[in-house]
Amino acid sequence: MRTKDGSTRGAGAPAKTAPAKAENRRLALSRAGSAHGCVDGAWWPTSANLGSELPDLVAVFSRWIGSIHRVVYDPVLWTTAPSRLIKHGSAISVDPYRMVHRETIGLMGTHSRTAILFVVAPAAPAVIAHKMLDLVECSAEPVAAATLLQRYAELSAEAMALQRCDDR
Protein backbone atom coordinates (compact mmCIF):
# COMPACT_ATOMS: atom_id res chain seq x y z
CA MET A 1 0.00 0.00 0.00
CA ARG A 2 1.15 3.54 -0.64
CA THR A 3 1.94 6.36 1.75
CA LYS A 4 1.28 9.98 0.87
CA ASP A 5 4.81 10.41 -0.50
CA GLY A 6 4.34 7.44 -2.85
CA SER A 7 6.58 5.04 -0.96
CA THR A 8 5.32 1.65 0.10
CA ARG A 9 4.88 0.20 3.52
CA GLY A 10 5.11 -3.48 4.25
CA ALA A 11 3.49 -3.12 7.67
CA GLY A 12 -0.14 -3.95 7.50
CA ALA A 13 0.24 -5.90 4.27
CA PRO A 14 -2.08 -8.85 4.05
CA ALA A 15 -0.81 -12.19 5.23
CA LYS A 16 -0.50 -14.79 2.51
CA THR A 17 -3.39 -17.20 2.69
CA ALA A 18 -4.59 -20.04 0.54
CA PRO A 19 -5.98 -18.64 -2.70
CA ALA A 20 -9.75 -18.51 -3.08
CA LYS A 21 -11.32 -20.90 -5.52
CA ALA A 22 -10.87 -19.40 -8.97
CA GLU A 23 -14.59 -19.14 -9.68
CA ASN A 24 -15.18 -17.19 -6.45
CA ARG A 25 -12.22 -14.83 -6.66
CA ARG A 26 -13.10 -11.14 -6.94
CA LEU A 27 -10.03 -9.40 -5.51
CA ALA A 28 -6.30 -9.76 -6.13
CA LEU A 29 -3.48 -7.86 -4.45
CA SER A 30 -0.14 -7.07 -5.99
CA ARG A 31 2.66 -9.12 -4.48
CA ALA A 32 5.23 -6.84 -6.08
CA GLY A 33 4.50 -3.80 -3.95
CA SER A 34 3.57 -0.57 -5.64
CA ALA A 35 5.08 2.33 -7.49
CA HIS A 36 3.85 5.64 -8.84
CA GLY A 37 1.21 5.03 -11.52
CA CYS A 38 0.81 1.39 -10.54
CA VAL A 39 -2.04 -0.36 -8.78
CA ASP A 40 -2.09 -2.14 -5.45
CA GLY A 41 -4.61 -4.68 -6.66
CA ALA A 42 -7.49 -5.50 -8.98
CA TRP A 43 -11.16 -5.85 -8.09
CA TRP A 44 -13.99 -7.52 -10.01
CA PRO A 45 -17.26 -6.33 -8.43
CA THR A 46 -20.47 -8.29 -8.96
CA SER A 47 -22.53 -5.27 -10.02
CA ALA A 48 -22.28 -1.66 -11.20
CA ASN A 49 -23.97 -0.44 -8.00
CA LEU A 50 -21.12 1.02 -5.96
CA GLY A 51 -23.36 1.40 -2.91
CA SER A 52 -23.89 -2.35 -2.69
CA GLU A 53 -20.30 -3.26 -3.57
CA LEU A 54 -18.37 -0.82 -1.40
CA PRO A 55 -19.13 -2.03 2.16
CA ASP A 56 -17.28 -5.33 1.72
CA LEU A 57 -14.34 -3.67 -0.04
CA VAL A 58 -14.05 -1.06 2.73
CA ALA A 59 -14.21 -3.79 5.38
CA VAL A 60 -11.36 -5.72 3.75
CA PHE A 61 -9.09 -2.73 3.15
CA SER A 62 -9.70 -1.16 6.56
CA ARG A 63 -7.67 -4.03 7.98
CA TRP A 64 -4.68 -3.09 5.80
CA ILE A 65 -4.69 0.70 5.48
CA GLY A 66 -6.58 1.67 8.62
CA SER A 67 -9.97 3.29 8.89
CA ILE A 68 -11.00 4.49 5.46
CA HIS A 69 -12.23 8.06 5.40
CA ARG A 70 -12.61 8.66 1.66
CA VAL A 71 -13.20 6.71 -1.52
CA VAL A 72 -12.71 8.24 -4.97
CA TYR A 73 -14.02 6.46 -8.02
CA ASP A 74 -14.33 6.72 -11.78
CA PRO A 75 -18.01 7.66 -12.33
CA VAL A 76 -18.04 6.04 -15.77
CA LEU A 77 -17.87 2.58 -14.18
CA TRP A 78 -20.85 2.83 -11.87
CA THR A 79 -24.58 3.14 -12.59
CA THR A 80 -25.31 4.31 -9.07
CA ALA A 81 -23.15 5.41 -6.15
CA PRO A 82 -23.75 6.88 -2.70
CA SER A 83 -22.24 10.21 -1.63
CA ARG A 84 -21.21 8.68 1.66
CA LEU A 85 -21.11 5.39 3.49
CA ILE A 86 -21.57 4.91 7.23
CA LYS A 87 -19.30 2.30 8.83
CA HIS A 88 -19.21 1.78 12.59
CA GLY A 89 -20.84 5.18 13.11
CA SER A 90 -18.30 7.07 10.98
CA ALA A 91 -19.01 8.67 7.63
CA ILE A 92 -16.84 7.78 4.65
CA SER A 93 -16.91 10.29 1.78
CA VAL A 94 -17.58 8.64 -1.57
CA ASP A 95 -16.65 11.03 -4.35
CA PRO A 96 -16.76 10.77 -8.12
CA TYR A 97 -13.44 11.81 -9.55
CA ARG A 98 -12.01 11.77 -13.04
CA MET A 99 -9.12 9.51 -12.19
CA VAL A 100 -5.77 9.86 -13.89
CA HIS A 101 -6.31 6.32 -15.11
CA ARG A 102 -9.78 5.17 -16.03
CA GLU A 103 -11.26 2.16 -14.34
CA THR A 104 -9.62 2.66 -10.97
CA ILE A 105 -10.87 3.29 -7.45
CA GLY A 106 -8.90 4.88 -4.62
CA LEU A 107 -9.29 4.16 -0.92
CA MET A 108 -7.79 6.64 1.55
CA GLY A 109 -6.96 5.27 5.00
CA THR A 110 -5.32 6.54 8.14
CA HIS A 111 -1.76 7.82 8.37
CA SER A 112 -1.77 8.82 4.68
CA ARG A 113 -2.03 5.20 3.53
CA THR A 114 -3.93 4.59 0.32
CA ALA A 115 -4.81 1.74 -2.00
CA ILE A 116 -5.45 2.11 -5.72
CA LEU A 117 -7.31 -0.73 -7.42
CA PHE A 118 -7.95 -1.50 -11.05
CA VAL A 119 -11.66 -2.25 -11.47
CA VAL A 120 -12.59 -5.03 -13.88
CA ALA A 121 -16.05 -4.33 -15.31
CA PRO A 122 -18.75 -6.30 -13.48
CA ALA A 123 -20.09 -7.56 -16.83
CA ALA A 124 -16.68 -8.91 -17.91
CA PRO A 125 -16.63 -12.63 -18.69
CA ALA A 126 -15.09 -14.66 -15.86
CA VAL A 127 -12.19 -15.84 -18.02
CA ILE A 128 -11.15 -12.24 -18.77
CA ALA A 129 -11.69 -11.07 -15.19
CA HIS A 130 -9.56 -13.88 -13.79
CA LYS A 131 -6.77 -13.17 -16.29
CA MET A 132 -6.76 -9.55 -15.11
CA LEU A 133 -6.68 -10.58 -11.45
CA ASP A 134 -3.84 -13.02 -12.20
CA LEU A 135 -1.88 -10.34 -14.05
CA VAL A 136 -1.89 -8.10 -10.99
CA GLU A 137 -1.34 -10.83 -8.41
CA CYS A 138 1.35 -12.84 -10.20
CA SER A 139 3.47 -10.06 -11.68
CA ALA A 140 7.02 -9.84 -10.37
CA GLU A 141 6.94 -6.07 -10.94
CA PRO A 142 4.32 -3.46 -10.01
CA VAL A 143 1.72 -3.15 -12.79
CA ALA A 144 0.73 0.23 -14.20
CA ALA A 145 -2.95 1.05 -14.60
CA ALA A 146 -2.27 1.96 -18.24
CA THR A 147 -0.84 -1.52 -18.84
CA LEU A 148 -3.94 -3.11 -17.34
CA LEU A 149 -6.25 -0.96 -19.47
CA GLN A 150 -4.37 -2.01 -22.59
CA ARG A 151 -4.42 -5.71 -21.67
CA TYR A 152 -8.12 -5.56 -20.79
CA ALA A 153 -8.87 -4.03 -24.20
CA GLU A 154 -6.82 -6.75 -25.93
CA LEU A 155 -8.56 -9.57 -24.06
CA SER A 156 -11.98 -8.05 -24.75
CA ALA A 157 -11.19 -7.72 -28.47
CA GLU A 158 -10.01 -11.35 -28.61
CA ALA A 159 -13.20 -12.51 -26.90
CA MET A 160 -15.35 -10.53 -29.33
CA ALA A 161 -13.47 -11.99 -32.32
CA LEU A 162 -13.96 -15.52 -30.98
CA GLN A 163 -17.65 -14.83 -30.41
CA ARG A 164 -18.04 -13.66 -34.02
CA CYS A 165 -16.40 -16.89 -35.22
CA ASP A 166 -18.72 -18.96 -33.02
CA ASP A 167 -21.75 -17.10 -34.39
CA ARG A 168 -20.94 -18.10 -37.97
PLM region descriptions:
Residues 1-11:
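N-terminal secretory-pathway/extracellular module detecting exported/lumenal segments
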Residues 3, 79-168:
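Helix-rich interaction surfaces within compact, conserved domain-sized segments
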Residues 9-38:
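N-terminal, Lys/Arg- and Ser/Thr-rich interaction peptides
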Residues 39-43:
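Short hinge/gating elements
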